[in-house]
């Protein structure tokens, strides 16, 4: 299995009515033994490529081989050794966890003692053992992804194609999912993980960066990040707010991209630019600008040619709201909501002041949506107050 590879030779896919190919001619090789990330924004061609590798779409030109099999000509042989987990869970939500596993085992012709041993291993691997009788539709997003992965692994595939498995999954479940996938890769499985999340891309040993159907980069994320050394900066001004400061900076020819980060403005400068160019630029107020550690996101945006330096249309129509700075505008006081004996929120207290961006963080089932619904008047609190 350590020799398992995917090879693409001029692989291309076009759809009627599109000016550009969904996947431009691709040439690359993907190896087993570690997780390879297929990274790009929505519409980059990630799902189309995955479907061609799984034999679900026929390429218009070029070819692919997956561990020696042509996905179209040898589809039966390939499907026996390939696991494909699509963006949608691929689960039957009106069936229980065990019923879903049994269905996939039937489809894979896994029977008898082999089925029993496989289920025991997968239920332990995914920590779904206590939930075998629960309907799939009643599982959290993270648990659904674990069940989807378990169903995909029933046939013990040599190749695993995961199409954006981290979407809609809370950070704790996503971390557990990554641990499971890294363990599988360590056993020699070939794993291709599709994502638009750049923090996920950094967890991959190798990445394929795509945009508008084209492959822009293949290699280690760290190697690409290192190309941004000396070009990432944090900027503040004692005389101007960050939003106005960002608008000014984005109009400068020396700036490739910028965004507000906490209490600073993060800038990516073009290769030939220096911090002094920004300090002395016409129209810029007094600023403090210091180099910061580059991120993979900086390199990715720069590779795309920058995210655009024109003023945001939305930002242009937003105006400062009058009010007392520091005034509390949203408040939860002992906010509690119970559904029967279950407390979805339990005496929650917080206050949001004018001008703040307040993050309400937590895993699936933590009570975030319930809190929002009470704040919006869509749910009546069991006790406590929601003030807006």
Whereabouts are the PLM-identified features?
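ABC transporter nucleotide-binding domains
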Residues: 3-6, 13-209, 329-330, 334-388
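A generic structural signal for secondary-structure junctions
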Residues: 83, 109, 229, 304-305
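Non-catalytic surface loops within mature trypsin-like serine protease
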Residues: 17, 32, 130, 239, ...
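Short, charged/small-residue-rich alpha-helical element at the C-terminal edge
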Residues: 229-303
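ABC ATPase "signature
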Residues: 218-219
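ABC-family P-loop ATPase nucleotide-binding domain
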Residues: 1-14, 284, 290-337
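Short acidic-hydrophobic catalytic motif
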Residues: 222-227
């Amino acid at each position: 299995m350590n020799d398992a590879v995917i090879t693409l030779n001029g692989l291309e896919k076009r759809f009627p009515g599109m000016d550009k190919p969904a996947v431009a001619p691709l040439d690359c090789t993907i190896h087993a033994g570690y997780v390879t990330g297929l990274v790009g924004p929505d519409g980059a061609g990630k799902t189309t490529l995955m479907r061609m590798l799984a034999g679900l779409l026929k390429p218009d030109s070029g070819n692919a081989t997956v561990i020696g099999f042509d996905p179209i000509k040898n589809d039966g042989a390939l499907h026996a050794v390939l696991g494909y987990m699509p963006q949608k869970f691929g689960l039957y939500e009106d069936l229980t966890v065990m019923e879903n596993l049994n269905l996939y085992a039937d489809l894979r012709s896994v029977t008898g003692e082999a089925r029993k041993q496989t289920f025991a291993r997968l239920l332990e691997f995914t920590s779904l053992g206590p939930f075998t009788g629960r309907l799939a539709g009643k599982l959290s997003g993270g648990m659904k992804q674990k069940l989807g992965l378990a169903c995909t692994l029933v046939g013990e595939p040599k190749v695993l194609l995961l199409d954006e498995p981290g979407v809609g999954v809370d950070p704790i479940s996503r971390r557990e999912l990554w641990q499971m996938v890294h363990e599988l890769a360590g056993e020699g499985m070939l794993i291709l993980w599709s994502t638009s999340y750049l923090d996920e891309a950094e967890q991959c040993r190798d990445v394929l960066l795509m945009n508008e159907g084209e492959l822009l980069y293949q290699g280690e994320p760290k190697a690409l990040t290192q190309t941004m050394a000396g070009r990432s900066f944090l900027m503040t001004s004692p005389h101007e707010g960050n939003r106005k400061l960002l608008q000014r900076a984005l109009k400068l020819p020396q700036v490739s991209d910028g965004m507000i980060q906490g209490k600073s403005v993060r800038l990516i400068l073009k290769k030939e630019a220096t911090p002094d160019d920004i300090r002395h630029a016409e129209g810029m107020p007094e600023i403090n600008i210091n180099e910061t550690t580059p991120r993979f996101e900086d390199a990715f945006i720069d590779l795309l040619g920058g995210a655009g330096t024109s003023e945001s249309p939305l930002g242009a129509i937003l105006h400062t709201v009058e009010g007392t700075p520091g005034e509390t505008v949203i408040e939860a006081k002992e906010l509690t909501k119970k559904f029967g004996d279950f407390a979805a929120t339990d005496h929650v207290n917080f206050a949001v002041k004018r001008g703040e961006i307040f993050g309400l963080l937590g895993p699936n089932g933590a009570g975030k949506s319930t809190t929002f619904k009470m704040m919006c008047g869509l749910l009546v609190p069991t006790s406590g107050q929601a003030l807006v």
